[in-house]
Amino acid sequence: MARLVALILAVVVAVAVLDLAQAEEQPQCARRGRSAPHRPHSVTITEFGAVGDGVTLNTVPFQNAVFYLRSFADKGGAQLYVPKGRWLTGSFNLTSHLTLFLEAGAVILGAQEVSQWPVVEPLPSYGQGIDLPGPRHSSLINGQSLTDVVITGNNGIIDGQGLTWWNWFRSNKLNYSRPHLVEFVDSKEIVISNLTFLNSPAWSIHPVYCSNVMVHNITIQTSLDAPLIDGIVPDSCSNVCIEDSSITVSHDAISLKSGWDNYGITFGMPTSDIHIRRVNLQSSLGAALSFGSEMSGGISDVHVDHLHIRGSTKGIFFKTAQGRGGYIRDAVISDVEMEDVGVAIAFTGDWSTHPGDHFDPTALPVISGITLKNMVGKNISVAGVLSGITGDPFTNICLSNINISLADSANSTSWFCSNISGYSELVFPEPCLDLHNPSNSSSCLSLPSYHAVAVA
């Protein structure tokens, strides 16, 4: 009997070890849960005096509701339910173990009065706001040092009503940098799903210093002529999954960042283990997918596949500058369809905006180990513009199985390269000689297959 028990225990342990090993081999998107956690306690925003007429200001009801729900954090968490209606509010903070749920027809509207958007200190990895030196306005929905937060619904809407902010930006009437729509700082286990985000004053979704972030089945839209509106911006984050979403903005649709010049170098928190798949992207004035230019903490271990990019100034854009320091390395982008794009693939080492004059010009970035493969482009103006830094070339840039059909009006020289080295195979039009180095072929990375992974 003792031998039988020992044998059973050995089998159980072996199975557990195998399951753990298989789980660790699965990409981040497969390991994340898709369903919102059960919350044993739920309240409706109307219980706190909110009125969904699109006119009544509901900042205090939202703040009071979250304050009340804090008491349930150690009791299984709670849900704040927002029913159908137009709920005008200023900035408010969330709490841990909370689900913010927007029913179909529910619209959270950002207030137009600047007093409803408090001023907060700049992020330490930036040293200033995105628009101006000094402090910045708090985002509409905020999370600071939180755990286990879900923002979801039945395709409810969060509308920043950003036109007022855009006009202030254009007319140089801002006193502080514009707010974002949703921002989580120093938080973990964040899920954002099944919602539409409209008209952010600046960036739409900004997780910064966060880990275990899941964004799926969302839509982001803004006016295509709005000033510098980004979609999703993972910033000094780890273990991030973005999938099954559609983003249409004026600037970068998805932008990976990690701090700005000496502030980012000193803070030293990289962005890593990023998985992006099955997303539709459009950027009228920027890039569909960008890396940097604020990347001073480093960006690595990025896996992107099954992108559809349309109507964008640039398709995939790696941007940095002298003074940034940091690195972008070990990124694989695969299975991309592009149409009506200005420049399909772009690298630049001259994106020279700095948060002040005190940056170190000797802090040179390292860009290496970037693979782009299995790409098709239609009606593309320029196949690629790849420009590194003199004395600091970008290396191990690998292109494979890429076919780009140029627009009739395209420049007859389809590739422009300088201070770049790498390898290419099965690429049309034929790329620059800088990308014909066979010694780089062994450095090209491969993308793990997602197809055999069961998704919960």
Residue ranges and their predicted role:
Residues A2-A456:
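Extracellular/periplasmic carbohydrate-active domains that bind, remodel
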